[in-house]
Structure formats: C-alpha cells, structure tokens
UniProtKB/Swiss-Prot annotation:
Disulfide bonds: none annotated. This is Succinate--CoA ligase [ADP-forming] subunit beta. Heterotetramer of two alpha and two beta subunits. Pathway: Carbohydrate metabolism; tricarboxylic acid cycle; succinate from succinyl-CoA (ligase route): step 1/1. Binds 1 Mg(2+) ion per subunit. NCBIfam families: PRK00696.1, sucCoAbeta. The keyword Nucleotide-binding applies. HAMAP family: Succ_CoA_beta. PANTHER family: SUCCINATE--COA LIGASE [GDP-FORMING] SUBUNIT BETA, MITOCHONDRIAL (PTHR11815:SF10), SUCCINYL-COA SYNTHETASE BETA CHAIN (PTHR11815).
C-alpha cells in the first residue's frame, strides 16, 4: 500500500525528522488559507498522487502569491495527473500539498528496501539526489552506498556515521544524518514498510539536512497489524478493476495487451502469460482466481476482464487439483451467459474431472473454443484475437 507525500511527512515528523511545514488541502480556498498559516512570501504546491514524475508533468509549482496557489488548486483538483509512472489515464488529484519553501544548497538521496536475499533492510544513500535512482544504479553504481540493518538489532549509529562520511557530510551534519537514519530505520521496522525513499534529502542554504520529499510503500501482508496506517489508504488511487477484484479475493493486475487471461494459481498464471507472449500475443492482465473458484467468482472475473475495452479474446486456463474442472466449466458457462461475452473465449481444462468439464462446455451450445493443451490454447487465443 502506497502513502501520499503528505502522509509520509506526517510519519517523518512523528519520528523527529526535519520536514517542511505543510497542509494537505482539498479545495482552492483551503490551499490559499494554508499559505497564511505557513507565512512567508513563497510556497511550494504539489499534486498528491501515487506516482513519481510530478514535476515534469506540471504537478509541482513554486508559487509567489495566494492567487497562484488558488489557481494551481483550481486547475488540478478533480483532474487526473499523467506522468511517466502512470498509464494514459493518469491518477486523480484529490489533495494539494501546500508547504513552505526551502533554500537548497545540495541534493542527496536516501532510501531503504527489504532485501529478501540477505533478509535485511538495506539503506541506500547517494550524493546524486533529485534524480532517478535506478538510472544512477545502472550507470554509476559506485555512487550508491549501502548499509544493511539486521531487524533483530535495528539501526546502529555507526552505520549512519559511515554513510555520512561517504556522502561528504561534515560537523553537525553528521549528527543530523545519524538522527534521520536512526529514525527512518526504526520507522521502517515499526511500520512494516516495504520501501522508503527521500529523494531529495537536501542540505539547506544554512547547512542543515531536510527531508524535502517522501515516498513510502507498506507491506500489504502486514496491514492487519497496522490499523493506523490502514486508515491512510486512498482508494481513489487504486485501479477500479483491481479494487473490484480484491473484493472477490481475486488477484488482478492490469496490463497493456489485448488477450484477457483467467487462471487458477499465480505460477500457472505467469506461465500462461509467458506462453501467450511466446506465440505472438500480448496479455491484457494477470488474473488468479485462486483455489476456491466458484461460479460467482468466475462471473466477476469475466466482468473485470471485459471491463477493459482493449480485450479482443479471453483465455481460461484451469488446472483441476483442489477445484473440479466440471464445476469450473459450469461457472464459465453461467458467466458467459450472464455477462453476455461477445469476444472469443478459449478454455483449457486439465486435471480433476477435465473430461467431464470439456463435455459440459461442448454441450453448452456457446461459442467456447476448447483447447487440447496449453500450447494449443495459446495459439488459438492469439489467432482469435488477431481475427477480431
């Protein structure tokens, strides 16, 4: 689960990290009033969406009057912001962050992720702040310095000092960096983060460290024990199809292709997408109906897949282990009738009661193409999609 920048900074402040005074505003009037609360003559206004690249897309502005703030809010609130990290539709802007302006002398990078290989939280720091860290990691990896935190021990001050020296910090900056590092490390463990990023962490004109931005992703599997963070979830940022799927305990991820996929089991779903690609097709989604597939869930799965206007054909690939293939066949027949599927549907059934399931599909009188193998299914669905 992602947090907005203003939510991340609120958490930073709770752990004693230096952040700008700011207010998340839902109306142009609130945004203008926030400038009065903050004071000063210059403010930064930022669209709050779960995506990077806001500045280049016009979603961040330096404002020198309340009229500019109000105009920025009027322009963006209720609209979608499209960045290089969003799809063509963009993300809806429901909040504008208005905060005080910071004089920047230098930009640094500080981030942390869970390294599953070492079973540690790995902090990364770089003198190249304010830019895409993936680009730095690819082109100049020597500029990224790391520190691994053992979750049983927690962050250590000596690790912070080592990173501070490598970043070229001096004097009181080392103490400030140590405080930030220790706070972030403890926050990461306390709040079950999967990713944390401050880009940039700046050195101000006065020589102090300041968290100018904040990005947080929380491990969704740990949300049951993070009720406070769970309340921060912003459903407006979710893909509507993914949100619909979650209500039915379906694992759905939208993609860019034109072949809808419905599979039971995540591994089989990934293998299905691979073989569709291998035969020249392009999957429109990842959808795992799981081991408890029922007629109702299959029906909802069809609805979700077909809500994507790009879908030209649907491939259903079911391995009957826990689930009986004849029951799945009944679900497919019922779903096709209820939803009124207009695109070709290719079905491959294998395993428990597969032959009985295939007979039910054949006797249904519906335009369902039965496949004899996974390769045959992929070839048939690619051919059907091209014919559309």
């Amino acid at each position: 689960m992602n947090l907005h920048e203003y939510q991340a900074k609120k958490l930073f402040a709770e752990y004693g990290l230096p952040v700008s005074e700011g207010y998340a505003c839902a109306t142009p009037q609130e945004a203008a009033e926030a400038a009065d609360k903050i004071g000063g003559t210059t403010w930064v206004v930022k669209c709050q969406v779960h995506a990077g690249g806001r500045g280049k897309a016009g979603g961040v502005k330096l404002a020198k009057s309340k009229d500019e703030i109000r105009a920025f809010a009027q322009n963006w609130l209720g609209k979608n912001l499209v960045t290089y990290q969003t799809d063509a539709n963009g993300q809806p802007v429901t909040k504008i962050l208005v905060e005080s302006c910071t004089d920047i002398a230098k930009e640094l990078y500080l981030g942390a992720v869970v390294d599953r290989g070492s079973r540690r939280v790995v902090f990364m720091a770089s003198t190249e702040g304010g830019v895409d860290i993936e680009k730095i990691a690819h082109e100049t990896p020597e500029l990224i310095h790391k520190a691994a935190i053992d979750p049983l021990v927690g962050p250590q001050a000596y690790q912070a000092r080592e990173l501070a020296f490598k970043l070229g910090l001096v004097g009181d900056q080392i103490k400030q960096f140590t405080k930030i590092f220790m706070g972030l490390g403890q926050m990461f463990l306390d709040c079950d983060f999967a990713l944390l990023e401050i880009n940039p962490l700046v050195i101000t004109a006065q020589g102090n460290l300041h968290c100018l931005d904040g990005k947080i992703n929380i491990d969704a599997n740990a949300l049951y024990r993070q009720p406070k963070l769970r309340e921060m979830h912003d459903p407006s940022q979710d893909d509507p199809r993914e949100a619909h799927a979650a209500q039915w305990e379906l694992n759905y991820v939208a993609l860019d292709g034109n072949i809808g996929c419905m599979v039971n089991g995540a591994g089989l779903a990934m293998g299905t997408m691979d073989i569709v690609n291998l035969h020249g097709g392009s999957p429109a989604n990842f959808l795992d109906v799981g081991g408890g597939a029922t007629k109702e869930r299959v029906t909802e799965a069809f609805k979700i897949i077909l809500s994507d206007s790009k879908v030209q054909a649907v491939l259903v690939n079911i391995f009957g282990g826990i689930v009986r293939c004849d029951m799945i066949a009944e679900g497919i027949i019922g779903a096709v009738k209820e939803v009124g599927v207009k695109v070709p549907v290719v079905v491959r059934l294998e395993g428990n009661n597969a032959e009985l399931g295939a007979r039910k599909l054949a006797d249904s009188g519906l335009n369902i193409i039965a496949a004899t193998s996974l390769t045959d299914a992929a070839q048939q669905v690619v051919k059907a999609a091209e014919a559309k």
